[in-house]
């Protein structure tokens, strides 16, 4: 296909006239992925995956490599931006019923799992105190699996404790997974354009559409500019805002940090894990906190797609959002009353959202006589 025809095809891509700013986060995620790949490549060039040299190599990157500090900060804060965008992207999908486009939703949830795995492996690489202990706590959860747990943990560690082989394979996984994310993102976009984007009203968009260019391209560029300004402001003025003070010390297996906690974007899953006083139960709850998203296309009972005209479901959704924030907050606190009770109630409410979704839909149908 000639170059002009491809451009024309892209320019004439029909898009619903009424899609709001919440639909811009997909293109922002693509920008985040590109940024992470570029900065990640330049960091990998200078990084050494060895337990004796990893921490020193990060210091070398920030001090000696030209613009290394910028690459490192862009990569670390870019990951936070990535998760901010993906959580908003998922929230929009929940609110406006985008999950009814099953294939797109299921591929997107798989992308989220891959992204979380990549971020976890990346957090271990600097080999600071919190990196080491976060890796120890999370990989230890595999031992909760009956029969196979211990074997799987030893296999993942490459020995009987977290050591040099663990760091090497985590670096390899952190390097290879983004290529899987690129492939799956392409599939995600392909599946989306089979049916086309939904819109805030949840109606069929075919009756009123406009060309993608110039309307949506300018809208995308505006949001990307805002995100870039935010990113560069944080990198320039508050580069350590998301960092844990413990991670500025080299990993020491003999000294346990007073309070082990992951990066902010994993706090809600960690909070759910900690709220259950049983290892296997906690590991299952942690897994289910993400896997429950896969059930949404199959439990939608309402005759209306979007929550725009569903006040009961709106109340449920915003309660769910508040619950997400409360769990994240309690996960930063020590395991003692009242935080344990708050996190247990919040974890229960988190899962109740997925149970109440079909019930609320059925109830609204009855009330509105649909």
Curated annotation (Swiss-Prot):
Family annotation (PANTHER family): CYTOCHROME B
Binding site for heme b b562: 75, 174
Subcellular location as annotated: Mitochondrion inner membrane
Lineage, uppermost ranks: Eukaryota, Metazoa, Chordata, Craniata, Vertebrata
Organism: Chilabothrus strigilatus strigilatus
Keyword Lipoprotein applies: no
Binding positions for a ubiquinone per the UniProt entry: 193
Principal place of residence: mitochondrion
Cofactor: heme b
Protein keywords: Electron transport, Heme, Iron, Membrane, Metal-binding, Mitochondrion, Mitochondrion inner membrane, Respiratory chain, Transmembrane, Transmembrane helix, Transport, Ubiquinone
The protein's name in its UniProt record: Cytochrome b
Co-factor remark: Binds 2 heme b groups non-covalently.
Misc note: Heme 1 (or BL or b562) is low-potential and absorbs at about 562 nm, and heme 2 (or BH or b566) is high-potential and absorbs at about 566 nm.
InterPro entries: Cyt_b/b6_C, Cyt_b/b6_C_sf, Cyt_b/b6_N, Cytb/b6-like_sf, Cytochrome_b, Cytochrome_b_C_euk/bac, Cytochrome_b_N_euk/bac, Di-haem_cyt_TM
Similarity comment text for this entry: Belongs to the cytochrome b family.
Function, as annotated: Component of the ubiquinol-cytochrome c reductase complex (complex III or cytochrome b-c1 complex) that is part of the mitochondrial respiratory chain. The b-c1 complex mediates electron transfer from ubiquinol to cytochrome c. Contributes to the generation of a proton gradient across the mitochondrial membrane that is then used for ATP synthesis.
Subunit structure: The cytochrome bc1 complex contains 3 respiratory subunits (MT-CYB, CYC1 and UQCRFS1), 2 core proteins (UQCRC1 and UQCRC2) and probably 6 low-molecular weight proteins.
